[in-house]
Amino acid sequence: MAEDQFPGWHGTTIIGVRKGDEVVVAGDGQVSLGQTVIKGSARKVRRLSPGGYDVVAGFAGSTADAFTLLERLEAKLEATPGQLQRASVELAKDWRTDKYLQKLEAMLIVTDGKDLYVITGAGDVLEPEHDVAAIGSGGNFALAAARGMMDSDRDAETVARDAMAIASDICVYTNGNLTVERIGK
């Protein structure tokens, strides 16, 4: 998330790790305005259950915008039960083409325990090549750290937590107060 994209507001780090039979999404709790930490315990990872279909989503960017997108994703999942990819593509298409949604400033990581995607306002639905996705100001740090741990005997949650710890040590807009959600295949 670039500084010019969200003037004055900085950061968060969200990571999704798929390893073995589980996927973990973790996010830090820091919200900053300029050089000031406004809140240290924000919850940016959520469990959704549209129609009994379990999905975990993490977001970076404007909270209100992210909630709008999560509501839209839930509606897409209710319309296409059990089809996260299709619902994600439909959300990305709407986000890209709808004049109201185009103004929303957020990114999402979503998983159903099988698939893992990053959804952007540019219309992208990206599936990571190496079973790790990360977004936000500390996303590149967390991504690099997690990729370095994927061949170890650590489970998905340990990889996510350790990668977030590294990101929070490097990125001043990321803290170590984590929300972690696990979901199995």
Swiss-Prot record:
InterPro entries: ATP-dep_Prtase_HsIV_su (IPR022281), Ntn_hydrolases_N (IPR029055), Proteasome_sua/b (IPR001353), Proteasome_suB-type (IPR023333). One of its GO terms (molecular function) is metal ion binding. It is found in: Cytoplasm. Na(+) binds at S168, C171, T174. Its EC number is 3.4.25.2. NCBIfam families: ATP_dep_HslV (TIGR03692), PRK05456.1 (NF003964). This is ATP-dependent protease subunit HslV. It comes from Ruegeria sp. (strain TM1040). The gene is hslV.
